[in-house]
A protein has these predicted regions:
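Conserved N-terminal segment of class I S-adenosyl-L-methionine
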Residues: 1-83, 89-93, 103-106, 145-149
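S-adenosyl-L-methionine-dependent methyltransferase catalytic module, highlighting the catalytic core
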Residues: 26, 55-59, 78, 100-108, ...
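A short His-aromatic
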Residues: 94-98
């Protein structure tokens, strides 16, 4: 299931796109097969990167017409290995709720996004997440799990301040 609407992100041919916290690559694959562009997926989990790679090799471009290029690697959202103003679009789907210093991750996202670039962010909705936390103390104590619940206005403020 994609949690970022690519139509709203408005990926154009030739764009350079970062999928931060790509996991198994669902958004990487969607962008790669959607537009002729360069998609870079990064995640902390090496096993996740291997699974994401399988998605590209399982469905290769058999026409030979695609100009899309992909790259995958292990990277930390707090220390992205990219120059300033590298990406036209950045996807960060269901990631920020896992990061203790998420404000620094936001700074990194803004740093690598070109002026005028677009950023697609998704986090779990407030009330369903709140209910999960209420029903199970273990839910938010899981290593690497959700450590924060966002309200939409709070997250918007974090990106615009």
């Amino acid at each position: 299931m994609k949690t970022i609407q690519l139509e709203k992100l408005d990926v154009k041919e030739g764009h350079k796109v970062l999928d931060l916290g790509c996991g198994h690559g669902r958004h990487c694959h969607a962008v790669y097969y959607h537009k002729d562009c360069q998609i870079i997926g990064v995640d902390l989990g090496f096993k996740d990167i291997l699974i994401a790679r399988e998605g590209f090799t399982a469905y290769p471009d058999l026409t030979g017409q695609s100009k899309s290029v992909f790259g995958l690697g292990v990277a930390d959202a707090l220390h992205l290995p990219f120059a300033n103003n590298t990406f036209d679009r950045v996807i960060c789907s269901e990631v920020l709720e896992h990061i203790p210093d998420y404000l620094y991750a936001i700074d990194e996202i803004l740093r690598v996004t070109k002026p005028g670039g677009r950023i697609g962010i998704s986090v779990p909705r407030f009330w369903p997440e709140k209910i999960c936390w209420f029903l199970s103390a273990d839910y938010h104590n899981e290593p690497g799990g959700h450590i924060r619940i966002f309200r939409a206005t709070e997250l918007e403020d974090d990106f615009t301040s």
